[in-house]
Design a protein with these regions (language model features):
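Bacterial N-terminal signal peptides that target proteins for export
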Residues: 1-11
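Intrinsically disordered, low-complexity regions enriched in serine, threonine, proline
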Residues: 2, 20-22
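Bacterial N-terminal signal peptides
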Residues: 9-19
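Non-catalytic cap/lid and distal C-terminal segments of serine-dependent acyl enzymes
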Residues: 25-297
Length: 297
């Protein structure tokens, strides 16, 4: 892969300008979009929480929580603005899942890791500040068995990275079209006008550090992480615009070789909201099962 094509792939990790026209739908839950102050990041971090139908009706009930991570170029409102909210309400209305919270934090271009230069410690923020904050602020159930993580594209990379690095914290992980590419592409620019493209990879160093990339890569982590008890689901389109199906196959092969149970699917489709919308329900049903929830009768 030449440098310009490599750059284009990662510039395009913004991938999806998610546009999905909302439709009339009787509300079955509630959305809160707020912010919290992070000492680690030295800034406010926005997040959106999707609260299940009975959240406001039963003030004593506690719920599992799914942390759902957005892709590059998106933000905490990904599920709210994309039509994902309608899909989630459909699942509740059709009684295909139990009730749990879904929380999406804004992650900018962090890839959900601590940056190479140490200035953007998003992983530390997420584990040390964000999880405790959400679980203090909302009526979540306590413990690993009631906490899942999932994501799309860059968010799929982040979900796998965080779950494989901290398997003691999560009972389940899902990733749709995760940004898995193996070895870091050779991306070098001498023209400062191209620095914006390189900036998309700045979290991995400037220039990007291949060794640092590999240390954080879910494909690397999957080879040795202690994944006992972690339920794993991932999928990708067979015509993924960025070739991420190859990385998904590689992850599948690694888990098979280690005899680690997981659910893996290659479906027809590319890297766009049409693909994600078609398969997001399966991921949410997977997490519902992992939480041990039965759909409401």
């Amino acid at each position: 892969m030449n440098s310009l094509r490599s750059a284009a792939v990662f510039a395009a990790l913004a991938f999806v300008s998610i546009v999905y026209a909302p439709r009339a739908h009787a509300s079955l839950g509630r959305i809160e979009c707020r912010s919290m102050r992070s000492e680690i990041l030295s800034r406010a971090v926005r997040y959106c929480a999707i609260l299940p139908p009975s959240y406001d009706e039963n003030k004593t009930q506690r719920y599992p929580v799914l942390y759902f991570l957005h892709g590059l170029g998106e933000n905490e409102q990904m599920l709210v603005s994309s039509g994902g909210w309608n899909l989630i309400e459909d699942l509740w209305e059709q009684k295909r899942t139990g009730e749990f919270l879904i929380v999406t934090p804004d992650a900018d271009t962090s890839f959900y890791i601590n940056s190479r230069d140490g200035h953007r410690r998003y992983e530390d923020f997420f584990i040390r500040e964000f999880l405790p904050f959400i679980e203090r602020s909302y009526r979540t159930r306590f413990g690993r068995r009631y906490r899942g993580i999932g994501g799309i594209s860059m968010g799929g990379y982040g979900a796998l990275h965080l779950a494989f690095r901290h398997p003691e914290l999560f009972v389940s992980v899902s990733a749709s079209s995760p940004a898995l590419v193996g070895a870091l592409p050779n991306v070098k620019f001498s023209n400062p006008r191209q620095s914006r493209l390189l900036g998309l990879l700045g979290v991995f160093g400037t220039p990007p550090d291949p060794a640092f990339w590999l240390r954080n890569d879910p494909l690397t982590l999957a080879r040795s992480a202690h994944l006992d008890g972690l339920k794993i689901y991932f999928d990708c389109g067979t015509e993924d615009d960025y070739g991420f199906e190859k990385g998904a196959r590689s992850l599948h092969d690694t888990l098979v070789a280690r005899r680690i149970p997981h659910e893996f699917h290659l479906y027809p489709g590319g890297h766009d909201w049409r693909y994600f919308a078609a398969h997001l329900p399966s991921a949410l049903e997977f997490h519902s099962r992992a939480f041990g929830l039965s759909p409401p009768q």
